[in-house]
């Protein structure tokens, strides 16, 4: 495909037009009085959202240079969302302000590389100030306030705070769609995975269609179990001990399954067979997690253990195991606490080293099952469009709350960034680097000004007033009052604010140092074929 090339000012201005098109659509959503954006979908109902990254993802521009500019800003929003779960609109507004000021200085003759270095040094200084001023999140109320700001709904904030209180900071909070109105919170104690009993004959509670085993032995096998002769010696030992048995294996089939079912029906021996969750290496890892949680060993020929030689010392234990046809919950496994802590640390290291979002999510789920618990927030709404929008807001708010616990909180509403600007005066920079730091100083006002504008107030007047207030005091845009924002519950996780600024500065540096853009040449659409009816189509003969 042929390419089209633009150089220096033309290239940078093309990129800036794309950035502005995207940023102007996103920034209307900033703040408590921000508006929504409607996104058309090829299939199904349109989506209504105020989430920056969702809006950014949908924007595709026609002009090749503008398209590249928009794609670069999408990267800012996506990266901020990946790291912190929120702050995508703030990041976009900051990027737009940095690029606008930066390009003005480049056009006036400043050296782009000098500006870039100045911007980087200034951002490092502001980040240092933010982390220093951050307040630790200690109470349930602080978590609720932070989550409520992200979701724009106090009831959602309260529910997330309760969920985090129950499952702990390491626990997983998932959001599901509900067929009813309102919000519900479901808590799962112990480890739950999405595989249930293999046969309905294992059910012990016919009304609830559940199989419940009290204080069972737990056998974990990495392969299929099909022949009964391998299993018999172990079954005899379990029967002698007067216990029930849970078998979790790749599969239980044939005569082995028949024997278990027949003994269950006759009342001779209580057991349940369940397929192991996951596939391949992930299945092995999850079996190992269960082994550590219950104090078992995984029976696998890879480590020289066979089913016929298995004795009770290789089995795990738990206070209770509950199975439905779709899922299994192991409550209070009898594993060694030090071994569990070691496994948790190992999974945490894997999360840090993982490049894949999918792998990271799966590892996070495994971590929660071992370290904390699982809370499910069920969200309902009147229409499908509203339901999707609400579910998305709750997911963002959950990640926002976790970010707050991780690094602490600072005053929200764009105030902290503006009030961090004086720290840049301590930087002893000269020439273009000093200009770069000044660009950051101007850009730090942009989020507050945009929040004020969206609230129907005069941005310049608000910024000047907040600049002269004591640290942490500023405009509460929801009420129009100037007050102590942390006391009023207007807080942002420092991780969100920091990530937004760092990612915006990163992309602004790329914009300023761009000297040429190579893009695909738009293909000319083929001229329509001539009308075979000679222009007289539609005549009725």
Curated annotation (Swiss-Prot):
One of its GO terms (biological process) is protein refolding. ATP binds at residues 29-32, 86-90, 413, 476-478, 492. One of its GO terms (cellular component) is capsule. Keywords: ATP-binding, Cell wall, Chaperone, Isomerase, Nucleotide-binding, Secreted. Its EC number is 5.6.1.7. InterPro entries: Chaperonin_Cpn60_CS, Cpn60/GroEL, Cpn60/GroEL/TCP-1, GroEL-like_apical_dom_sf, GROEL-like_equatorial_sf, TCP-1-like_intermed_sf. It is found in: Secreted, Capsule; Cell surface; Secreted, Cell wall. It is an enzyme of class 5 (isomerase). Coiled coil: none annotated. The keyword ATP-binding applies. GO terms for molecular function: ATP binding; ATP-dependent protein folding chaperone; isomerase activity; unfolded protein binding. It catalyses: ATP + H2O + a folded polypeptide = ADP + phosphate + an unfolded polypeptide. SUPFAM superfamilies: GroEL apical domain-like (SSF52029), GroEL equatorial domain-like (SSF48592), GroEL-intermediate domain like (SSF54849). Its main location: secreted. HAMAP family: CH60 (MF_00600). NCBIfam families: GroEL, PRK00013.1, PRK12849.1, PRK12850.1, PRK12851.1. Purified 65 kDa antigen can elicit a strong delayed-type hypersensitivity reaction in experimental animals infected with Mycobacterium tuberculosis. This protein is one of the major immunoreactive proteins of the Mycobacteria. This antigen contains epitopes that are common to various species of Mycobacteria. Forms a cylinder of 14 subunits composed of two heptameric rings stacked back-to-back. Interacts with the co-chaperonin GroES. Belongs to the chaperonin (HSP60) family. Together with its co-chaperonin GroES, plays an essential role in assisting protein folding. The GroEL-GroES system forms a nano-cage that allows encapsulation of the non-native substrate proteins and provides a physical environment optimized to promote and accelerate protein folding. This is Chaperonin GroEL 2. It comes from Mycobacterium leprae (strain TN). The gene is groEL2.
